[in-house]
Amino acid sequence: MSVIRIVPEPRPLLDQVFRLGESPIWDDRRERLFFVDIDAGEIHHVTAEGSSHRMWIAPPPDRPTALGLTSAGRLVVALTRSVVFLDPDTGAWDALAEIDVGLSTTRLNDGKVGPDGAFWVGSMDERPVDEREPVGALFRVTPDGRVEKKLDGLVVANGLAWSPDGRTMWLADSRGPWIDRFDFDPATGEMSNRSRFATPDEEMGRPDGCTCDSGGFYWSAGVSAGRLNRFAPDGRLIEHWDLPVAWPTMPCFGGEGLRSLFVTSLARPGVAAPARATVPAGTLITLPAQISGLPPHRFPDPRG
């Protein structure tokens, strides 16, 4: 089966360049897209049309790396080495859990709320690429603040997603590079039957952040190739979407009917972008999708 190449016509959502845009998540109650700029220490939200832009700054020297939504309307936020709550209405921060990531050069990275109601977050070696080692791990944080290490031996944990029925989990290592599949029990949070799902290379697009659509297809940001890769549930690459922005970091579905894609990207000052990149690197873009996404799971909030 041949791979379909799609050249979409996205538009920038904001007239702003972000240093390391990541973790977009659509809040269906507020009808806002939340996302982070890790290196700037910022959390942002904006409407699907690009209006009502607001920003929150993480308590220095911490940096926000990943977001989830809670049942009470707060955000659950992965910082460098901890997980906290942020109330977007009041700006109040509340602690949830400290995470022992090991080395001082290791930090938390990609994270999401799973179908089990826990916040899952991976860690990464933040040293220069040629010095990185598999010191990262995958953690599960429960609403009462308990932390369980579920997996270790990762270089850059990334690409967390779950299937529509919650019984398949995906995890990527951006420096593996690989994407693995697990059987998942949404009642207990147990992972089993690990298998290799895909091995995207630099040309195909090193796997960064991801999302899953309503058909159970896995969308991976191919950060090194400037594209989105759409994989079938059996691991076959069926589409790749060439993007006009270099270095995309993570897609998510949102907007009306969850039929828009939002894609964050990173800026690399001093590095020339590919010739086809017509949008500045670090731009947040949006484009119509051919299929709907899945509503995000919500973290049970102690506030109710």
Regions found by a protein language model. Name each.
Residues 27-28, 33-39, 75-81, 119-132, ...:
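Conserved beta-strand positions in repeat-built beta-propeller and related beta-rich domains
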Residues 2-18, 47-51, 97, 194-195, ...:
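A short helix->beta-strand "capping" segment at the edge of beta-propeller domains
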Residues 252-304:
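Blade-level signature of beta-propeller repeat domains, shared across WD40, Kelch, NHL, RCC1
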Residues 9-15, 51-58, 94-101, 146-152, ...:
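A short beta-strand motif characteristic of beta-propeller blades
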Residues 178, 182, 199-236:
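Loop/turn-rich, solvent-exposed surfaces of beta-rich toroidal or solenoidal domains
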Residues 42-44, 82-84, 136-139, 178-180, ...:
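A short loop-to-beta-strand structural motif that recurs across blades of beta-propeller domains
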Residues 16-30, 59-76, 102-118, 150-168, ...:
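Beta-rich, blade/repeat-based domains predominating
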Residues 182-190, 289-294:
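Short loop/turn segments immediately following beta-strands, especially the blade-tip
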